[in-house]
């Protein structure tokens, strides 16, 4: 199908997503019809070889295939294209194909959606696209309305680490949805990340880091409610992918973040969502029990990663507090930064370093959940902000030690 120049392009990477793709496609169709009726629009499905009929569902879908809706009819044809990508299955190759298509069609605004995000709405799709299309932003990150106890891998580790390093307050640095400009796409396509492990499993984090470190005009916009995402990746594998990607991004972008101090708020291109969200039903006991059980087994490994004072504090905490432990902010920050430095030094196989961090992360998360499971959302948000500030205050020591490692190489 010849499409030519387009105004708005939405890309959806897929691999065996027949069970979830239909509401995503429907939301895109409705966003095109309601909010961009005069624009040339195209939906690109970049498929990694699905065997469940996902591409056919995309090609045959329509905006009202599950219910009758009243929309402003588009004045232009909405194009749908489903095409396989080549190479190792993974979002990196799919995103590369989507960006290549956007570059070829000179798309003014591009949004990327996850095929598992079944709760995405037409308004959410439009909220991502508008800042690029109408306000000339280069990169748009979503802000979900979700309870602050939800998503602890982001709130306890990735968000404060990325904020302290890059100096920008991005609430969802690992979000599978984002929007970007043709200028940012041209930049991304020139980078050497696509055939790497980071490109295969950590492309979402890399895109965020590249936008911040590349000096592009970035913003955030509200999406409500938090889309339901059905992850099919086991926790251990997901943790290793996300943390390894974050550490690798910090290596790649060190020239940008090492001189930065503090953090700045990222511009808001739209109102933040305000709907009420229930807290996750957990008190963290199971996580702290796993920490207390596994820490001693990891002692030999941790001796090669952590400083003596940090390791001694962890062992003492596990011995005296057990499953009722309180993992202080300062100790958690020291833990994460020392793991990052060990990752850079290569004290052992990098996957083993990251795997050793997982039980400590569970202990920190369990401790936080136990402490704040009954707290008001405002109190939890204040505690998360305090954690971010601890990461920022400890950054000068990290920078000094990082630079010392560079001098030794």
Kindly give the residue locations of the regions a language model identified.
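Cell-envelope/extracellular polymer assembly enzymes that use nucleotide-activated donors
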Residues: 7-9, 42
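Short, well-formed alpha-helical segments that are part of the catalytic scaffolds
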Residues: 17-33
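Short beta-strand-to-loop acidic/aromatic patch adjacent to the donor-nucleotide binding site
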Residues: 107-118
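Conserved donor-nucleotide/metal-binding helix-loop-beta segment in metal-dependent transferases, i.e.
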Residues: 120-143
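Short beta-strand-to-loop element that shapes/binds the nucleotide-sugar donor at the catalytic cleft/hinge
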Residues: 138-152, 167
């Amino acid at each position: 199908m010849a499409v030519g120049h387009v105004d708005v392009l939405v890309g959806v990477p897929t691999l065996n997503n027949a069970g979830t793709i239909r509401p995503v496609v429907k939301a895109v169709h409705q966003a095109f019809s309601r909010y961009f009726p005069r624009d040339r629009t195209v939906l690109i499905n970049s498929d990694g070889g699905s065997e469940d009929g996902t591409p056919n569902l995309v090609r045959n879908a329509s905006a009202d295939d599950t219910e009758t809706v009243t929309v402003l009819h588009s004045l232009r044809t909405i194009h749908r294209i489903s095409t396989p990508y080549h190479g190792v299955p993974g979002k990196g190759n799919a995103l590369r194909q989507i960006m290549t298509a956007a570059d070829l069609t000179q798309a003014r605004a591009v949004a990327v959606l996850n095929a598992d995000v079944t709760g995405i709405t037409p308004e959410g799709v439009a909220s991502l696209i508008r800042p690029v299309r109408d306000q000339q932003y280069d990169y748009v990150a979503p802000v979900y309305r979700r309870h602050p106890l939800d998503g602890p891998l982001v709130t306890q580790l990735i968000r404060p680490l990325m904020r302290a390093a890059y100096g920008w307050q991005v609430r969802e640095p690992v979000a599978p949805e984002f929007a970007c400009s043709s200028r940012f796409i041209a930049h991304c396509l020139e980078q050497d990340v696509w055939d790497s492990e980071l490109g295969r499993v950590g492309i979402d984090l890399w895109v965020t880091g590249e936008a911040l470190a590349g000096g592009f005009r970035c913003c955030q916009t509200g999406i409500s409610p938090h889309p339901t995402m059905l992850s099919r990746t086991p926790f251990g594998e997901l943790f290793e992918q996300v943390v390894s990607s974050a550490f690798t991004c910090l290596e790649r972008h060190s020239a940008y973040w090492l001189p930065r101090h503090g953090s700045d708020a990222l511009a808001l291109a739209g109102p933040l969502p305000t709907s009420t969200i229930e807290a996750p039903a957990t008190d963290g006991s199971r996580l702290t029990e796993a920490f207390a059980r596994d820490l001693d087994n990891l002692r030999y490994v941790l001796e090669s990663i952590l400083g003596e004072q940090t390791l001694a504090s962890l062992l003492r905490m596990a011995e005296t507090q057990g499953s009722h432990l309180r993992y202080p902010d300062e100790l958690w920050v020291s833990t994460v930064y020392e793991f990052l430095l060990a990752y850079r030094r290569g004290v052992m196989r990098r996957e083993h370093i990251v795997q050793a961090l997982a039980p400590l992360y569970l202990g920190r998360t369990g401790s936080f959940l136990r402490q704040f499971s009954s707290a008001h959302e405002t109190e939890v948000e204040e505690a998360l902000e305090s954690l971010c500030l601890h990461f920022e205050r400890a950054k000068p020591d990290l920078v000094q030690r990082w630079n010392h490692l560079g001098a030794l190489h």
